[in-house]
C-alpha cells in the first residue's frame, strides 16, 4: 500500500511541476492541458533521462532523475511566473473543471491499484519479459 502512495505522490508532483508548461503549450485545449499533465510529466522526465543516459551525458541514477525533475520544474516555474496573471485567472475560473479532472484521475488510479492488488503476480502474457527488462534497466547506469 505504501508503494501506491509513493506512486501517487510522485505522479501528482510531476503533474503539478509540468502544469505551467502544459498551460502555455496546450492553450487551445479547454482545460489548458491540465488533464494530461501527469502522463506528460512522466514522459518528459523519462524521455530527457533516457536521451541523456543513452548519449552517456549523465548516468541513469536517482540523482540524475532528481536533477532532471528540478530542471523541468524550474523551467515550469519560470513559465508560471511569466504568465502568473493569466494562470491565476484560469485556475479561478475553471476550478470546478480542474477538481473534476483530479477526482476522475484519483478514482481511476486507486481503482486500478485495487484491481491489480487482487492479482499482482507476474505470470501471464508478456509480463515475465517485461519484468526481465525492468530488472535489467534498474541495474543499468546508461541508456545503451
What do these predicted ranges mean?
Residues 1, 93-101, 107-144:
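Active-site lumenal/periplasmic loops and adjacent helix-entry segments of GT-C-fold
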Residues 1-95:
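Membrane-embedded, hydrophobic transmembrane alpha-helices
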